[in-house]
Amino acid sequence: MGPQRDITRRLLVALVASGAAGLVLAAPSAASTECRAGHGSADVVGKPGPVVAWRAALSSRVPTHTRVPGRKKTRRAGTARTVGPGDAPWLLVLRAKNDRKGRCWVRVRLPWRPNEAGAWVRAQHVNLRPTRWRIRVNLAERTLVLHRGRRAVLRTSVVIGAPITPTPQGLFSIVGVWRWNPADFLGSYILPLTAHSPVLQEFGGGDGRVGIHGRGGESLLAPLGSMASHGCIRLPNGAIESVVRRVGAGGLPGIPVRVR
């Protein structure tokens, strides 16, 4: 995160203030309500793997559960109790299973704290779609790699969090896609993640959400390969533009982002 800037706060303000910047969403189509979706080798909805992962599209708010309901009494997950497209239009599917009645449930990555929070939702309440895209961030090497299946299609050096404000590690997903001013500190695109700073509970008026974004203005002073941000992952504008162009703005929300 740049100096005195919080991605969540800036994005919301910008969306209200200007029609030029906006969240680009994919339009959900016909839903798959089965744990087996019938897409060849990826027909079984399950955990993210090296070849395919699954995204769950939200068209309305749905209840979340800490476990798949069965004989034991269950409670809804977290304080929000429901998750909707205003939180994240697409959620990363972590696994799937059937309940005692044969109904399919999917465990999804939640877009709020704590990091790597997850909950179960009914598969019939979401649209399930496979994706072959994933992103891996190597903190030791200061690199980001975009994969399509097992093939790496883009590799770039990045700026990561400073030692006192480290980039969080874990399995996250992209929340949205924002086109931005290339000359601004945040560069040409911003991809907010489900990740939050492990040390900054709030930042610049927001909740310390971490994202992937470009570089411009003062952020160019920190060279690629350095540890200088408040947790965000900074790419060259050309690299993040290539990510958006290759995957498509509608295909990015919900794809897995592994940071380690």
Describe the role of every protein-language-model region.
Residues T33-D99:
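Beta-loop motif signature
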Residues T82-H125:
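SH3/SH3-like beta-barrel superfamily modules
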